[in-house]
Amino acid sequence: MDKLKDKVIWVTGASSGIGKELAYQLSKRNCKLILSARRKEVLEKVKNQCSNPKDVKILPLDIIEFEKADSYVEIAIDLFGKVDIQINNAGVSQRSLIAETDFSVYKTIMDIDYLGTVALSKAILPHFMLNNAGHYVVVSSLMGKFSSPYRSGYCGAKHALHGFFDAMRMEHEKHGVRVTMVCPGFVNTNIAKSALTGDGTLQESNDSATQNGLSTTNFCNKMITAIKKEKFEVYIGGKEVKGVFIKRFFPKLLHKLVLKSQVR
């Protein structure tokens, strides 16, 4: 029997990319899904394309409306009576040099990629504690383990997620709370197109590394396996995954390798 069968899973950033593919694959596994993103009409389309749309509810939200986190959680719990797994997938990337990036862009990235996730996760914590069970799944990035040019704000926000959720795991393991940090490498989504540039506008173009990355289908299969195994951390991608281990033992070598790669 599939360990995730009948679990209530709340996915943020569910309107596209990894979040959308997760919805499709989890629906095939007979999970009960709550899909969140800003655009209600897009969420409806994703729901209708799921294998079991009757077991899919949508909860439109803007993750940076921190003051509404408690009410969003209350609504999410009421939809099926509980939430078993919260998949924090909403986020935005960046493509700009530090010297050419407005400070406001850093604030926007931090609000979306870090504080929005923290707000929703903290709001649902009492529910997990009450049930003595709950699983946070956080879509971070390999950029949460090491850095790369043009992604300074994105790297900073993803590094922050690891700091927060490592503490969450330690403080609430005794309450049955689990944390899985998922670190994608290059995945073929529109993340580069929607990345913020130095003045806050969208890049609106893709790059070869992203286009040649893992398919969302392949990536999500591996991610779901990690969720079922309740792994602490998982790194999913191509050869770029080796950067995590090179960073740990040979940080100067990784510095040279990343600069040589000239990845945008």
Model-assigned labels for residue ranges:
Residues 174-238:
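SDR active-site lid
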Residues 141:
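Residue(s) in the substrate-gating loop at a strand-loop-helix junction
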Residues 60-71, 103:
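The beta1-alpha1 cofactor-binding region of Rossmann-like NAD(H)/NADP(H)-dependent oxidoreductases
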Residues 121, 157:
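Active-site helix of classical SDR
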Residues 15-16:
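Conserved glycine-rich cofactor-binding loop
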Residues 97-98, 102-108:
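Substrate-binding pocket helix/loop in short-chain dehydrogenase/reductase
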Residues 29-46:
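Conserved glycine-rich Rossmann-like NAD(P)H-binding loop of the short-chain dehydrogenase/reductase
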